[in-house]
């Protein structure tokens, strides 16, 4: 087991945001977190990364408990994150945005370095955009940069928050293919997503998150057959 959360509870003031969330991600697996906006998907991702502190529960990564470990140490141990808003610096080139991760990976004890050619294999379009300023990129291009910057950390688990949001069908297809290539590199993915069809393209399994609870777990095919989930997922 690569990642496991055990009964995570998270509050914002008196609001109970996550309720006893337990989930697992195996090595070389793509797992979806499916649910409506505000269901708690992003909060799960941020608890795993250490940006949010759960009130109770445990987080295990590669067999070690990381519940109270700093975000920096979690990243150094093999977690990486591409946020929904991409956070590409507009005045920096694509090359400079990606290489922001270099100083972190140099601290990794395993000595691994990022192979830029692997990044181009995942998103071939980036080769032509390498010197372009971040402020001159489309939304889809910014997300490519954000994911590549996360991959520059040489993670074991990539956390993606709404990576398909706002993308055209063509770009969604490119991203779906990219996720398959990322898994072929031996990297697992935990993907927060509101669209079942997009998740079904890439995920081995998915958890349905509703009002902070994981109410169902199964393959995308199994989820599609559950009529009771239609209202939750807006199908």
List where the protein language model places each region.
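ABC-type ATPase nucleotide-binding domains, specifically the catalytic core motifs of the NBD
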Residues: 13, 92-114, 122-124, 218
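The feature captures the beta-strand-to-loop junction immediately N-terminal to the Walker
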Residues: 34-36
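Helix-to-loop junction immediately C-terminal to a conserved catalytic motif
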Residues: 49
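Conserved ABC transporter NBD signature motif
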Residues: 57-65, 77, 111-116
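Conserved ABC ATPase signature
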Residues: 133-137
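ABC ATPase C-loop
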Residues: 150-151
